[in-house]
């Protein structure tokens, strides 16, 4: 199993009001309900580069919508948007890793995710 590393900054954190009904735009999370549900982020790779991800509500009761978020094309400067305080990053079909985003995070806050020591626990997906 490959070693998992995520080193980068979350530079587009945005809180949203409950159940807004506006359209989703690039780099924004309008249209996402603000609650404590976990969202699953499926990262799409191009070779060794992280290029995009889809953020999906784990309970697909919001019309099963998928929300695309754009990543930078290298792992040193990952850019993502987030509208919930916790979501699940799935790096491949067999492992999962949880990351927390502070509830008081504001737009353009810098949040650094670095490899934990000891490493985070991974479990089958």
UniProtKB/Swiss-Prot annotation:
Source organism superkingdom: Viruses
> How is this protein named in the record?
Protein 5
């Amino acid at each position: 199993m490959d070693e998992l590393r995520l080193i980068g900054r979350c530079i587009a954190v945005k809180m949203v009001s409950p159940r807004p009904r506006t359209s989703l735009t690039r780099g924004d999370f309008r249209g996402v309900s603000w609650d404590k549900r976990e969202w699953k982020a499926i990262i799409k790779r191009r070779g060794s580069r992280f290029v995009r991800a889809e953020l999906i509500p784990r309970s697909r009761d919001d019309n099963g919508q998928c929300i695309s978020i754009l990543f930078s094309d290298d792992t040193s400067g990952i850019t993502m948007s987030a509208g919930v305080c916790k979501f699940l990053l799935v790096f491949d079909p067999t492992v999962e890793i949880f990351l927390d985003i502070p509830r008081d995070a504001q737009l353009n806050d810098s949040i650094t995710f670095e490899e934990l020591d000891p490493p985070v626990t991974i479990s089958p997906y």
